[in-house]
From Swiss-Prot:
A GO molecular-function descriptor: structural constituent of ribosome
Pfam families to which the protein is assigned, alphabetical: Ribosomal_L16 (PF00252)
The protein, known as: Large ribosomal subunit protein uL16m
Cleaved signal peptide residues: none
Domain of life, per lineage: Eukaryota
SUPFAM superfamilies: Ribosomal protein L16p/L10e (SSF54686)
Subcellular location per the Swiss-Prot or TrEMBL entry: Mitochondrion
Source organism of the structure: Oryza sativa subsp. japonica
Length: 185
């Protein structure tokens, strides 16, 4: 991860990080939790209690935790419940950073902060192509994060309103769920 990027986690993410033992490659300064940085800066647990979990449907309701801006002045809010893959989270983060680099250059390194408030902690399994049915569940292929309606996956601060709006618009194309731009008032 870049040196200028500061990453803080929500209470739910900290609870998940305490639940799953993780390897240290760098530390998050605010909460002091250890997280993994593997596969192009993607964060996910090193090991979980079970290697495979049931699919479970995403609840359509709104959870109170994570629905308000907690760290930054601007953010993106999910309009409906869904699942975010670890690749979509990383792609949205990189799109946001890229927009700030284009618009602000050196000022971004000094002032801007981005918070990723979701952690891909659930493994997804899949079977290879052209394999017959049966013989158990497939091997883990990736990680997802469940996002409820109204949850804020990304926050940013230290940028102008127009730059934040543009970055949120670019980042909204990456995840599969629809999002909207929110501003602290």
């Amino acid at each position: 991860m870049e040196k200028h990027l500061v990453m803080y986690l929500t209470r739910k993410s900290i609870m998940l990080l305490r639940k799953y033992p993780l390897v240290t490659e760098f530390q998050v300064s605010k909460c002091g939790s250890h997280i993994v940085k593997i596969r192009r800066d993607v964060l996910y647990p090193k090991r979980t209690k079970y290697s495979k979990y049931s699919k479970c449907r995403c609840s359509r309701g709104c959870e109170p935790d994570g629905t308000q801006l907690g760290f930054g002045r601007y953010g993106t809010k999910s309009c409906r419940a869904g699942r975010l893959s670890y690749r979509a989270i990383e792609a949205a983060r990189r799109a946001t950073i890229g927009q700030f680099h284009r618009a602000m250059s050196g000022q971004f390194r000094r002032n801007c902060k981005i918070w990723v408030r979701v952690l891909a902690d659930l493994p997804i399994t899949g079977k290879p192509a052209e394999v017959r049915m049966g013989r158990g569940k497939g091997n883990p292929t990736g990680w997802i994060a469940r996002v409820s309606t109204g949850q804020i996956p990304f926050e940013m601060d230290g940028v102008s309103l127009s730059n934040a709006r543009q970055a949120a618009r670019l980042a909204a194309h990456k995840p599969c769920s629809s999002t909207k731009f929110v501003q602290w008032s």
